UniProtKB/Swiss-Prot annotation:
Intermediate capsid protein that self assembles to form an icosahedral capsid with a T=13 symmetry, which consists of 230 trimers of VP6, with channels at each of its five-fold vertices. This capsid constitutes the middle concentric layer of the viral mature particle. The innermost VP2 capsid and the intermediate VP6 capsid remain intact following cell entry to protect the dsRNA from degradation and to prevent unfavorable antiviral responses in the host cell during all the replication cycle of the virus. GO terms for molecular function: host cell surface receptor binding; metal ion binding; structural molecule activity. It is found in: Virion. One of its GO terms (cellular component) is viral envelope. GO terms for biological process: fusion of virus membrane with host plasma membrane. The keyword Metal-binding applies. This is Intermediate capsid protein VP6. Keywords: Calcium, Capsid protein, Intermediate capsid protein, Metal-binding, Ubl conjugation, Virion, Zinc. InterPro entries: Capsid_hemagglutn, Rotavirus_A/C_VP6, Virus_capsid_a-hlx_vir. Its main location: virion. Zn(2+) binds at H153. Belongs to the rotavirus VP6 family.
Length: 397
């Protein structure tokens, strides 16, 4: 993996900097590094592909070295270099694709394709190493079973979940009270509602709670908490729990009271925030507990009182809600997030070449399925293929 990254980094630099008109002295170190890559690769043969519709390709390396000059690089010099660069880039691209479509239930962090296994040999260690990538750094740590740490922007840590629970229900579905939520990606939206606006509740107040367990521990998280759940702020028709009928939800939004958010790790409270909105932080946690109240307004203008009558029919439904969004966090496990395309890169290659479903990943690389059942085997394989995807993205967009 180190060699593959170093190859890709050298090729990217060469493609960007070995251009016509450049002073040789400005790229002499890069050309020496480029020549060392050629010397190391010459005389070797590789084979990639042969899984799904990914074609088998054979690769042979026999390239001349780039020479020295006292002047600027001319068109002939650059053309010679380009022919070599293009072949090497094509090779790295195919090695990456070959690796991204393979998986193993045991030691999935290790190279799985024949070509990458061969590149792991001692003879290729002479290629100049550059391990500045966060992915390659963490791959090395994971390969040695040491603690890793990935920084994510809007991490996709919550499996998709959209549902409701009813604390009070009637066959006619005309006087309901309960909670509905939508968890997806890095965001939780939860709403508590009461058709009667807590008229018969103790102290005219309804209490709601929403608990979300994460599949992996997050640390040093920056979080946004808002006293609203915009996805539940408009009328909708909702299927009943048994699917036999539907019921009408027509929300009127109130501000939640006594809002509290707790971040827990192994059942122990790490951070607690009460009635604090905007930006908050959490040190480390694997569970989020949100609690909030719907309080019937003690004083109402006639217009508001008309919305919340003392008896049925209840045509408008009192609703309070919260939005919690993880803006950034550190996780020991690799995740998909908003700032990278690794999941899309891997998935698109597997789809394009009709790669059969293997023993580790779910069909279509379904992220909700993958993160819901995030086994150690999936974690190892995902870190490997994301690392390879990050290497490929240096050369192929």
């Amino acid at each position: 993996m180190d060699v593959l990254y170093s190859l890709s980094k050298t090729l990217k630099d060469a493609r960007d900097k070995i251009v016509e008109g450049t002073l040789y002295s400005n790229v002499s170190d890069l050309i020496q590094q480029f020549n060392q890559m050629i010397i190391t690769m010459n005389g070797n043969e590789f084979q990639t592909g042969g899984i799904g519709n990914l074609p088998i390709r054979n690769w042979n390396f026999d390239f001349g070295l780039l020479g020295t000059t006292l002047l600027n690089l001319d068109a002939n010099y650059v053309e010679t270099a380009r022919n070599t660069i293009d072949y090497f880039v094509d090779f790295v691209d195919n090695v990456c694709m070959d690796e991204m479509v393979r998986e193993s239930q045991r030691n999935g962090i290790a190279p799985q394709s024949d070509s990458l296994r061969k590149l792991s040999g001692i003879k290729f260690k002479r290629i100049n190493f550059d391990n500045s990538s966060e992915y390659i750094e963490n791959w090395n740590l994971q390969n040695r079973r040491q603690r890793t740490g990935f920084t994510f922007h809007k991490p996709n840590i919550f499996p998709y979940s959209a549902s409701f629970t009813l604390n009070r229900s009637q066959p006619a579905h005309d006087n309901l009270m309960g909670t509905m939520w939508l968890n997806a990606g890095s965001e939780i939206q939860v709403a508590g509602f009461d058709y009667s606006c807590a008229i018969n509740a103790p102290a005219n107040t309804q209490q709601f709670e929403h608990v979300v367990q994460l599949r992996r521990v997050l640390t040093t998280a920056t979080i946004t908490l808002l006293p609203d759940a915009e996805r539940f702020s408009f009328p909708r028709v909702i299927n009943s729990a048994d699917g036999a009928t539907t019921w009408y939800f027509n929300p009127v939004i109130l501000r939640p009271n006594n809002v509290e958010v707790e971040f827990l790790l192994n059942g122990q409270i790490i951070n607690t925030y009460q009635a604090r909105f905007g930006t908050i932080i959490a040190r480390n946690f694997d569970t989020i507990r949100l609690s909030f109240q719907l309080m019937r307004p003690p004083n109402m203008t006639p217009a508001v009182a008309a919305l919340f009558p003392n008896a049925q029919p209840f045509e408008h439904h009192a609703t309070v809600g919260l939005t919690l969004r993880i803006e950034s966090a550190v996780c020991e496990s690799v995740l998909a997030d908003a700032s990278e395309t690794m999941l899309a890169n891997v998935t698109s290659v597997r789809q394009e070449y009709a790669i059969p479903v293997g023993p580790v990943f779910p069909p279509g690389m379904n992220w909700t399925d993958l993160i819901t059942n995030y086994s150690p085997s999936r974690e190892d394989n995902l870190q490997r293929v994301f690392t390879v995807a990050s290497i490929r993205s240096m050369l192929v967009k």
